[in-house]
Amino acid sequence: MSAESLLHNTFSTEQIEVLENEYAAHNYHPLPVCFSKAKGAKVWDPEGREYLDFLSAYSAVNQGHCHPKIIEALVEQAQRVTLSSRAFYNDKFGPFAKYITEYFGYEMVIPMNTGAEAVETACKLARLWGYKAKKIPTDEAIILSCVDNFHGRTMGIISMSTDPDARDNYGPYLPNVGPKISGADRVLRYNNIEDLKYYLDTFGPKVAAFLVEPIQGEAGVMVPDDGYLEEAYKLCKAHNVLFIADEVQTGVARTGKMLCIEHSNVKPDVVILGKAISGGVYPVSAVLSSREIMLNFEPGTHGSTYGGNPLGAAVSIAALEVVKEEKLTERAAVLGEKFRTALIECKSPIVQKVRGRGLLNAVVIDESKTNGRTAWDLCLIMRSRGVLAKPTHGNIIRFSPPLVITEEDLMKGIEVIKKSLNDLPTIDMTPYAEKPIH
């Protein structure tokens, strides 16, 4: 089959599944639905079936799929210049750097492409600062993170992970990073201020940074107790440790604040952004910090061929403008409250908990009451009824629709979720089961 026919033929969902299973590594287990077209909060498969997207590419399309303003910026810039590398200046990165730093209230930015790259960049920056400013002995800097974190999948980042799926069989791991440091008598648990106090009291002079998610998304939308992040920040300041907020999934209005950390009235020393800063049309990420911290980077000490490219810069400016112009922060706060209230009030016996902030929410399924059915089965039922979501960590389903979703569509989605919850323990799963791929 020629490249032209592969690109322009219309394949069925089943054909797409076969092609992907045959030619792509099996490092994902997708829900059996294929996106062929998308607009706003809706997607369509090759057969023309319409769905409400309640995942938003893990919060990358906060502004909705194929937002016209963002697509226009992409097309216009793609026709002018797409890549210069940082070997030269381009006429979009400088304006983007000014725009994003003023937008989030920081002094300097270093641009990257993916969330994981931005996390790695922030960790390198923290180590640089630790050696050059804090005077930590060479090769002894520590970066702390929490149990059940998710910051990405690079070798450096999985050294911090406690998730067996992300970590196992990839060793050996980097020392001095993560929730368990050699010589400690405990792990550093999320939402446990005593654990952080222990680590800073024990290792403080060698700790460069504490890296934390304001809400642990992949762990099941774990919202910390009120006061936890404030106290964590104060402890970091007392020990001269950088407080780094990973806002790749939680940032850009998703939780009803521009940055999720704003719920805690904390301004981190370093903020990591990705996903929705480019509206889901081009990979862009960024690390924001003060001039004093950022200037520890010198020419040649870090870089990225694509980081700061004019195409990504133009797209990101448009994407961030959309957030403010369409008041997506306020929409997320209002619609998120309606979502949680509706699911709590339905009083489903199989729902253990509903939690979240803004339009980043999770429903915990009590699989002891579902007659052997699982959260995955529930997602298959919802898919057949036009709502797309996916489990995280087994019995937890994350719901995070685009922030542009109308209230009418949100309520339609909620009704599908409620009916599917009601039907799960007794429904015949045969029509919903995944077909084997040959």
Swiss-Prot record:
Its main location: cytoplasm. It catalyses: a 2-oxocarboxylate + L-ornithine = L-glutamate 5-semialdehyde + an L-alpha-amino acid. Keywords: Aminotransferase, Cytoplasm, Nucleus, Pyridoxal phosphate, Transferase. Its cofactor is pyridoxal 5'-phosphate. Disruption phenotype: Prevents arginine conversion to other amino acids. Its EC number is 2.6.1.13. This is Ornithine aminotransferase car2. The lineage of its organism: Eukaryota, Fungi, Dikarya, Ascomycota, Taphrinomycotina.
